[in-house]
């Protein structure tokens, strides 16, 4: 297969980090948005739910369009949509207008994930692809975590409007840069692949294992993003910490995530621990973190604690969970599509859309149970972690049955 041009790793990185960094920057301003529009915090949080639904729709459709029309034009189209919707968000006069703009923004920015992954697969194969992903992995964990700090400083020294000014400027710079230098990597643009797409869709609909993997990935990412949409109300609104200080606190989670990523690599490459055992260890870390989080949350409801102690009682369990998150999720993504090797692009877009719908559902639940304390969210985290562990056990049972046949 002839490659038209390889995409450099730094271009992939800019695509990959755009969406998660956008969301972590935005969530720092949720309390400010709530006060500005004079609405309940739970309503403000639903803007993130719509964001993930828009993202799911983008993954499902834009990835497919890039197979037909090429990666470069669809990537540029997505960035253009991202910029326009960010500009519209600046002038939102009510929460409904902002919700629509956020949905469209997510639809556009989804090219960072779906087109970025497609371009990576077009440009690199085998061990070279693994090396590119491995070299980018620490940055993919580190840079989005800076988003809370960036958002915190923007909110503290200006207003939520300037969050979208920031998105508009960064999006415009990326669009101009990529218009000049982004290569086309799809060497076999094909206008007649719809039959294959629907064939894969029919198989996926019946694939119980894939649905269970989608639930696990969606649940764990739902916990991650759910924390970022709930925590600002607890720390900024209730504990009265500054927006910038909250951003620094949220940044601590990145170190736990990076540690989990390096621990997984060490166990697999240096200690030759089987991938499935690493996944099991990830569940153990997650369960321990979520159980401790739930216990601490209910203790904080009945016992008065200093701000420093309360912060530690919330962040330490989440850091433990994040270690588990990054032991588990990379392995889950690897195994989920193992039976779809010949149609990874098509299957990946459908699979990604499914688990982003799960993330949207989790963030919607977070908005519905929003309260003045963290206990409701902590209980949800515990339930999701237990449910994911049960799903993993069901996958193991289904694999055993499959191999017996």
Swiss-Prot record:
Signal peptide: none annotated. It is a multi-pass membrane protein. Gene3D superfamilies: Multidrug resistance protein D. Pfam families: MFS_1 (PF07690). One of its GO terms (molecular function) is xenobiotic transmembrane transporter activity. The chain crosses the membrane at residues 3-23, 42-62, 73-93, 95-115, 135-155, 162-182, 209-229, 248-268, 280-300, 309-329, 346-366, 377-397. GO terms for cellular component: plasma membrane. Keywords: Cell inner membrane, Cell membrane, Membrane, Transmembrane, Transmembrane helix, Transport. It comes from the Bacteria. GO terms for biological process: xenobiotic detoxification by transmembrane export across the plasma membrane. It is found in: Cell inner membrane. Its main location: membrane. Belongs to the major facilitator superfamily. Bcr/CmlA family. NCBIfam families: efflux_Bcr_CflA. This is Uncharacterized transporter RF_0358. It comes from Rickettsia felis (strain ATCC VR-1525 / URRWXCal2).
